[in-house]
UniProtKB/Swiss-Prot annotation:
One of its GO terms (biological process) is urea catabolic process. It is found in: Cytoplasm. It comes from Rhizobium etli (strain CIAT 652). GO terms for cellular component: urease complex. Keywords: Cytoplasm, Hydrolase. It holds the Pfam family Urease_beta. Heterotrimer of UreA (gamma), UreB (beta) and UreC (alpha) subunits. Three heterotrimers associate to form the active enzyme. Pathway: Nitrogen metabolism; urea degradation; CO(2) and NH(3) from urea (urease route): step 1/1. The keyword Cytoplasm applies. This is Urease subunit beta. Belongs to the urease beta subunit family. It catalyses: urea + 2 H2O + H(+) = hydrogencarbonate + 2 NH4(+). The keyword Cytoplasm applies. Its EC number is 3.5.1.5.
Length: 101
């Protein structure tokens, strides 16, 4: 073993196993690309994105931590969302929640 070396287990690692999911169609109605990070409260994303915000309340993208999804102008795509975990408190973003979900 080399100091600092990380030896990962063999096989695939399933992310967010067992988390309930919801799939939404999202359209970028704006004239600029919008990028949304893995742990951003999806309901509070850029107003140029058109989707069912009530269905996205308390949820984030089901993608690996530290990654993002980019929506080009005029683009429509499906995204899968999972519930925010932990204390389920949301602060900042667009300041639409500022507390418990």
């Amino acid at each position: 073993m080399i100091p600092g070396e990380i030896i990962a287990a063999s096989g695939d690692i399933e992310l967010n196993a067992g988390a309930p999911t919801v799939t939404l169609e999202v359209s970028n109605t704006g004239d600029r690309p919008v990028q949304v990070g893995s742990h951003y409260h999806f309901a509070e994303t850029n107003a140029g994105l058109s989707f069912d915000r009530a269905a996205a309340h308390g949820k984030r993208l089901d993608i690996p931590s530290g990654t993002a999804v980019r929506f080009e102008p005029g683009q429509t795509r499906s995204v899968t969302l999972i519930p925010l975990a932990g204390k389920r408190e949301v602060y900042g973003f667009r300041q639409l929640v500022m507390g418990k979900l």
